[in-house]
Amino acid sequence: SDVIIATRTSNIGMGGPAMVEGGGLGVFKPEQIGPAAVQHGNGVIDILVDDEAQAVAAARQYLSYFQGPVADFTAPPAAALRDVVPENRLRVYDTRQAMEGIADVGTLQHLRTGFGQGIHTALARIGGRPVGLMANNPAHLGGAIDTDAADKAARFLQLCNAHGLPLVS
């Protein structure tokens, strides 16, 4: 699948309690197998939401990026980026704020936020056109790319390529 959207109370596992017990791994309750918090942290869940209504809204937003450009959009305020990126390149800043400063208002959808903290990835619209946004996170390992961040970036690049979305990095 392209994306996995889950609620915080959901579980994702390869087998249930009987399979785990049959494999000699102990006795577990169904809710102990593959909790969303664990799966989000290891990169399995792309978008984690509070409830099913938010999941439906997230799915609709996600699918909207593959419908092409829209004529009705609101660009972010021109001053939105003015204070986000510091003049001193050695200072840490929040790349998610920079993404918000270039994306059309209300169109930013971050992916895999619990995994690969060295890279921030998101789908958005700029001038009504759907795009992928990707940025190194200078607050994590000084912006260095570790294995989780590389995995996250590679998967995001595949997603953008598969759907013909331009990448802004």
Per-segment meaning from a language model:
Residues S1-A71, L165:
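Conserved catalytic cores of soluble enzyme domains
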Residues S1-I5, I12, D146-C160, L165-S169:
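Extended, hydrophobic alpha-helical segments in both membrane/secreted and soluble proteins
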Residues V49-V131, A135, A139-L157, N161:
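Intrinsically disordered, low-complexity segments enriched in small/flexible residues
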